[in-house]
C-alpha cells in the first residue's frame, strides 16, 4: 500500500504520494489513449538498427570529449567552471560573456545545460538498447549530483547550476532522468525530486510560456505517480493562455522556430492523453497537417532554417528536429495508433536522420537539406546565416551546439516507440517496422516475438513467436499507408503460434512525386537521391572526428526530368536489390532512370551556394541515365529535380509603396490591423513611390527604402505590377516575404504568414491565380514586429515575387 509523505517547503505543506519499490518493468501510463509504451526491457533493436546505435555509442554519443565546449565539461555534475565563445554569441542577450566560477553562475546562462542535457538523454537512450555501461555511468553520476543538490527551500533542481530563470533546460534533463528510470527503475528519486521542483514553482508555473511551458510533459508524468491533480489543472491553464493554443490548426503559414514548434506540437496530444478531451487531439493533428502542408520536404521532415521556411528543396532543416519531431509523433501513436504519424516517423528515421550524419556517426550537419551538392564551410545556402556558418558541413560539433547534443536522441527515440501495447488487451503492437524483438507475457507464459527483416530495404517482415510453452499470441501490426495492399494505413491482427513464422508482405512501388516545379523518386518510406561526383577532403587527416569538405564538379548535376518520359520509366523500372553489410552506408537498392541535361543549374551560386531548381529549364538535347539510391546512404545529393515543362516567366515590372508607415501591434493578428491603403486600387500606388530592387533576383528591400526612419512595430504596403500579354488561367505567383505578411490579389486575401519570416531567403509560397492580359497587381502588407533590428538582419523586411504561366505543376 502506498504511503503518504508530508513534505514541507517554506512553511507550506503538500502531500506527495510515495511510490514504493517501483521496478524497471513497472510502468504507469496516461489514463487515456488506445496504446501505451512497452517496458524498455521488452524491446531490442536488431540488424541495421542495432548497428546504428552501436555506431552512435562509438561516435559522438560516446565521445563527448571530442565535441568541445560544453560537452567536454562535467555536464550537469556541478556548476560549469567557465564558458567559451569561439564562433559566435548565443546567450539570450546578444552580449558576449567569457566568465568563470561564481561569475558564470550569476550570468544566468542556460544554453550549455540545454545542450548537455540533450547529450545525457541520448546517452541514456542508447544505453537502453545496446550494451553501453560507460554511458549509463555518466548519466547516473549526473543524476546523483542534481538530485543531491536540489534547493532545500523550494526543491528547485536547476538553481545550483545557474541563476537563469529559464525552465527549459529542466525539460530536457527530465527526459534524460526518465530514460534512465525506464531502464533502471529509478522512479522513486525522479518522482520525489521533480514533484518537489514543480511544487516549489506552483505560484508561477501557470505563467510559463514558450519553452518553459514544455515542462507540461514532466508535470503530467509525475502526476501519474503522485495523483496531484493541481499539476494537470495548471498544465491546462498554461496551455489555454498560450500562443500555440490560439495558432495550432489555423489554415495559415505558421512561421515558428523549428525546435520550439516540434516540441510544442506534442502539448495538445499530452493533454488529450491525460484528460480524454478529443478537442486537444483534433487540434494537434490539424497543427501537424498544416505544418506539413506549408513546409514539408522530400525526406519526410519540414523545413526549419531555425524558422520554418517553406517547401522548396534549397531550404534545410535543423538536425535537432529529427529527434524532437519523432518524439512528438510518438505521442500520437499512444493516442490512437495514427498510422499516418507512424509513416512520418519512419520517413524521418530512414531518410532525414541518416542523411544528416556520416555513417560512422562521428560527424553531422547542423542544417541538412534534400538538395546539397556542396557541404563545406560557409556553404550555408538557407536564409538564416546565409554564407556565414559551417552548418551544412559534416563536423563533429557545430555552434551553437544544440544539434550536436540532440541528434543523439533521434534513433533511440524511434526504437523506443517501435513496439507498444494495446491498453484494452495488453496485446503487443508492431507500430514501427524494422529488425527487432519484443518480449512479453501471456497467461503466465513468457514469450518473445522476433521481427526478421531488412525493412525499409526489403518488402517483407517475418514475425516468429518463441516460447517454452504451447502458446498463441495475437499481435497488431501497422501496414503503412503507402503500401500496395487493400488494408494499407491500418493496424491488422496477426496470430502467432509458438515456433511458427508469419510473413507480412509490404509491397512498395517506385513512384514519381511532384511538388510545384520540382520532382523526386520515392519507394515506400524511402526517398531516393542522385549522388553527384564530388571531391571530399578531410580537414585534419587521420582524426576520425575531422570535418569534411565536399565540393561538387560543375556540370555533373544539372539535370531535369522530362515528366512524360520519367512517368513511363518509373512504371517500367526494375529496382536492383543488393546484398550489403550496413544499408545506411552502402545502397541496398538502386534504380537507373532517364534525365535531361539543362543549360541552367550547373554551377553554384557565387561559387559556394546551392541554387534553387530553375522555374524554367531549357534542355540542351543531351539525354542521360543516372542512378538513384536511398537518401539515407548519401552525404552530398540531388533529390529534387526541375522539369522541362514549357513555362513563361512574366515580367514583374515594378513594386510601389505609398511611402507611409503605420503602427503595428505584434500582439494582435495582422489581419485585424488594416489601414487606408488596403482599400485603394492598385493604381493608387503607381503615382507614388517606386521601390528599387536591391538584389538581382528582384528582392524589393522595404527596410532599405525606409532607411533612417523608425521601423520597429510598424507595417507598410507594397504593390507589385506584373505584365502579361495574354489571359492565362494556369498562372502561379511565387511570393517570398517577411516579416509578417498578408497578400491580396484583386482585393482577396491569397496568403498570410504568422510569425517571423525572412523576405529574401524565405522559400516562396506558390499561389495559383490566373493573370489577365495587361497589368496585374498583388498588394502585400508587411509588418516589422521589432524583435530583430534591421542592422542585425538587413534583408528581413521586404518581398520577392516571381510569376509564371503555363506548364504542369505538382500539388
Regions found by a protein language model. Name each.
Residues 10-25:
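Bacterial N-terminal signal peptides
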Residues 52-104, 110, 114-121, 134-142, ...:
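Extended carbohydrate-recognition surfaces in non-catalytic/accessory domains of CAZymes
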Residues 487-499, 505-518, 742-798:
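Beta-strand-rich ligand-recognition modules
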Amino acid at each position: 500500500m502506498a504511503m503518504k509523505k508530508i513534505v514541507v517547503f517554506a512553511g507550506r505543506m503538500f502531500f506527495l504520494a510515495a511510490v514504493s519499490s517501483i521496478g524497471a518493468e513497472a510502468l504507469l501510463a496516461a489514463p487515456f489513449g488506445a496504446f501505451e509504451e512497452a517496458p524498455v526491457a521488452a524491446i531490442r533493436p536488431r540488424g541495421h538498427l542495432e548497428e546504428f546505435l552501436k555506431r552512435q555509442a562509438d561516435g559522438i554519443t560516446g565521445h563527448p570529449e571530442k565535441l568541445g565546449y560544453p560537452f567536454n565539461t562535467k555536464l550537469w555534475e556541478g556548476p560549469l567552471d567557465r564558458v567559451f565563445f569561439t564562433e559566435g554569441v548565443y546567450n539570450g542577450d546578444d552580449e558576449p560573456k567569457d566568465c568563470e566560477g561564481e561569475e558564470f553562475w550569476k550570468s544566468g546562462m542556460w544554453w550549455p545545460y540545454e545542450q548537455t542535457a540533450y547529450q545525457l538523454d541520448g546517452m541514456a537512450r542508447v544505453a537502453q538498447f545496446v550494451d553501453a555501461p560507460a554511458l549509463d555511468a555518466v548519466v547516473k553520476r549526473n543524476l546523483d549530483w542534481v538530485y543531491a543538490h536540489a534547493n532545500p527551500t523550494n526543491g528547485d533542481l536547476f538553481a545550483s547550476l545557474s541563476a537563469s530563470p529559464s525552465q527549459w533546460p529542466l525539460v530536457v534533463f527530465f527526459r534524460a532522468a526518465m530514460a534512465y528510470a525506464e531502464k533502471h527503475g529509478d522512479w522513486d528519486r525522479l518522482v520525489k525530486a521533480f514533484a518537489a521542483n514543480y511544487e516549489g514553482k506552483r505560484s508561477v508555473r501557470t505563467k510559463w510560456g514558450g519553452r518553459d511551458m514544455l515542462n507540461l510533459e514532466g508535470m503530467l508524468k509525475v502526476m501519474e505517480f503522485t495523483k496531484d491533480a493541481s499539476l494537470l489543472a495548471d498544465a491546462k491553464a498554461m496551455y489555454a493562455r498560450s500562443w500555440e493554443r490560439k495558432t495550432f490548426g489555423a489554415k495559415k503559414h505558421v512561421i515558428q522556430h523549428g525546435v520550439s514548434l516540434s516540441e510544442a506540437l506534442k502539448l495538445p496530444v499530452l493533454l488529450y492523453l491525460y484528460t480524454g478531451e478529443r478537442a486537444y487531439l483534433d487540434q494537434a493533428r490539424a497543427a501537424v497537417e498544416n505544418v506539413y502542408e506549408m513546409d514539408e520536404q522530400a525526406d519526410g521532415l519540414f523545413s526549419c532554417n531555425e524558422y520554418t521556411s517553406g517547401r522548396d528543396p534549397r531550404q534545410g532543416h535543423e538536425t535537432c528536429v529529427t529527434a524532437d519531431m519523432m518524439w512528438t509523433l510518438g505521442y500520437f501513436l499512444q493516442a490512437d495508433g495514427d498510422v499516418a504519424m507512424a509513416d512520418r516517423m519512419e520517413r524521418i528515421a530512414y531518410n532525414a536522420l541518416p542523411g544528416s550524419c556520416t555513417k560512422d556517426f562521428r560527424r553531422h550537419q547542423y542544417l541538412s537539406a534534400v538538395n546539397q551538392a556542396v557541404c563545406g564551410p560557409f556553404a550555408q545556402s538557407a536564409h538564416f546565416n546565409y554564407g556565414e556558418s559551417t552548418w551544412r558541413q559534416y563536423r563533429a560539433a557545430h555552434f551553437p551546439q544544440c544539434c550536436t547534443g540532440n541528434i543523439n536522441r533521434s534513433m533511440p527515440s524511434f526504437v523506443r516507440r517501435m513496439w507498444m501495447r494495446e491498453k484494452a488487451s495488453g496485446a503487443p503492437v508492431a507500430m514501427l517496422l524494422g529488425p527487432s524483438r519484443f518480449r512479453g507475457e501471456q497467461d503466465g507464459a513468457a514469450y518473445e516475438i522476433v521481427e526478421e527483416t531488412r525493412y525499409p530495404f526489403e518488402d517483407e517482415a517475418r514475425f516468429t513467436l518463441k516460447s517454452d510453452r504451447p502458446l498463441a499470441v495475437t499481435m497488431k501490426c501497422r501496414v503503412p499507408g503507402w503500401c500496395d495492399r487493400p488494408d494499407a494505413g491500418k493496424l491488422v491482427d496477426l496470430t502467432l503460434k509458438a515456433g511458427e513464422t508469419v510473413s507480412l508482405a509490404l509491397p512498395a512501388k517506385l513512384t514519381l512525386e511532384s511538388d510545384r516545379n520540382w520532382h523526386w523518386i520515392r519507394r515506400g518510406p524511402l526517398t531516393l537521391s542522385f549522388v553527384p561526383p564530388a571531391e571530399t577532403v578531410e580537414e585534419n587527416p587521420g582524426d576520425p572526428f575531422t570535418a569534411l569538405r565536399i565540393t561538387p564538379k560543375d556540370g555533373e548535376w544539372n539535370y531535369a526530368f522530362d515528366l512524360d518520359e520519367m512517368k513511363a520509366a518509373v512504371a517500367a523500372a526494375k529496382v536492383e536489390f543488393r546484398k550489403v553489410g550496413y544499408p545506411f552506408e552502402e545502397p541496398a537498392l538502386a534504380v537507373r532512370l532517364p534525365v535531361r541535361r539543362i543549360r541552367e543549374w550547373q554551377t553554384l551560386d557565387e561559387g559556394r551556394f546551392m541554387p534553387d531548381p530553375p522555374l524554367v529549364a531549357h534542355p540542351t538535347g543531351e539525354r542521360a541515365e543516372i542512378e538513384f539510391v536511398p537518401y539515407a546512404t548519401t552525404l552530398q545529393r540531388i533529390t529534387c529535380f526541375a522539369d522541362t515543362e514549357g513555362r513563361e516567366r512574366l515580367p514583374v515590372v515594378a513594386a510601389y509603396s505609398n511611402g507611409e508607415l503605420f503602427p503595428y501591434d505584434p500582439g494582435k493578428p495582422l489581419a485585424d490591423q488594416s489601414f487606408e491603403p488596403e482599400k485603394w486600387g492598385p493604381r493608387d500606388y503607381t503615382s507614388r513611390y517606386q521601390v528599387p530592387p536591391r538584389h538581382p533576383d528582384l528582392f524589393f528591400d522595404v527596410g532599405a527604402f525606409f532607411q533612417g526612419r523608425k521601423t520597429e512595430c510598424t507595417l507598410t504596403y507594397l504593390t507589385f505590377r506584373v505584365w502579361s500579354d495574354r489571359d492565362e488561367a494556369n498562372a502561379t505567383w511565387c511570393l517570398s516575404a517577411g516579416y509578417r505578411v498578408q497578400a491580396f490579389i484583386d482585393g482577396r486575401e491569397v496568403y498570410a504568414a504568422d510569425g517571423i519570416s525572412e523576405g529574401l531567403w524565405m522559400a516562396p509560397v506558390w499561389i495559383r491565380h490566373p493573370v489577365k492580359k495587361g497589368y496585374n497587381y498583388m498588394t502585400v502588407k508587411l509588418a516589422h514586429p521589432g524583435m530583430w533590428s534591421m542592422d542585425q538582419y538587413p534583408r528581413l523586411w521586404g518581398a520577392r515575387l516571381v510569376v509564371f504561366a503555363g506548364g504542369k505543376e505538382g500539388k
